[in-house]
Amino acid sequence: MFPLGLSMLWESVEPEAALEQRFGFNSFGAATHWVSAVLEQTWGLTVLECLRMAISDQNAIVWVASDRGGLVVKCSRATERFAYLEASARLLSALAGQGVPVPSPITSLNGLDRETLEGRSCAVSFTVLPELAGDWLDVQDHAAVRSAGACLAEIHRALGATHVDGSVFASRSTGLKERIGGWLENFDRGFAPEASSRLAEFLARAPQLGDQTQLIHNDFRAANILTRNSRITGVLDFDDVVIDHRVSDLAKACVYLGTMFTDWRPTPIAVRQSLRAGYESVRPLSRSESEWFEILELWHGLMAIPDENDTAGWASAL
């Protein structure tokens, strides 16, 4: 859990300075006083205490004790993403209605899942979520990892059956072979040349992927997964949903599953295998998907290498 009061989610900057520069408040107390007023006036909720606030880029998350129990208030000043965030909130509500373990937005007095309000220095998009019980996924708990894999497959099923306006969600405009080939040609920084050569060889003989694109989570990892007794109690952060292939989402999840906010290291192979096994217990991959999984896992792994000073060992994990 994050510390009480004000903190940064992952950036190495002073939180007080970030709060004032990004949201216009000169103290944690001033910011939480405003959040409390917003919840009362726009949601009809009584705030008992604002416990903590974490800032991440143009966003802030506030944990609140209220007359409706524990709440998580998500705020964003990224105006270019407001339409996307509104669609993401509607998507959360739809998924919760299908029994997916996600926090369903609490509707405002206007009947909306997300509201845009004028803040101290900028417009702010708000959504209010119930706080889900559980601890972040421990990737050393292989039973929990298998449960996470099964949960991802169920999320894919639910996303595929959810009827929402997908026009605001980014869609990959080119096929996987063209996309990866373009990356190898134009964006590969050469940090793991042997792995890059292997990827090019795999790509040259890759089969046609017999699978349609759909909405996928796109950020399925330990920091966004809550567990209790090796079972999944919540999946968080649908703010990066895109339209792409399900097997790409699974491969990316295998690569990044063990990452947390400031603890960014590769996922051990045994953990990746457990996640995939859990996924396939619900939705087995087709033959072409299995071949593409190996390609995509290698590609996502290559893209994860931060720079030449790869102290976490991303390159050696390939």
Predicted regions and their residues:
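Active-site catalytic-loop/activation-segment of kinase and kinase-like phosphoryl-transfer enzymes
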Residues: 9-15, 127, 167-207
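A cross-family kinase active-site recognition segment
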Residues: 138-191, 213
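Active-site activation/catalytic loop segments of kinase-like enzymes and analogous catalytic loops
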Residues: 247-284, 297-313
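Active-site acidic catalytic loop and adjacent metal/ATP-binding pocket
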Residues: 57-68, 72-73, 105, 203-248
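A glycine-centered beta->alpha junction motif in the catalytic cores
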Residues: 111, 122-139, 181-184, 299-314
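Conserved NTP-binding catalytic cores of kinases and kinase-like/nucleotidyltransferase enzymes
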Residues: 1-109, 228-231
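ATP-binding pocket architecture of kinase catalytic cores
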Residues: 66-164
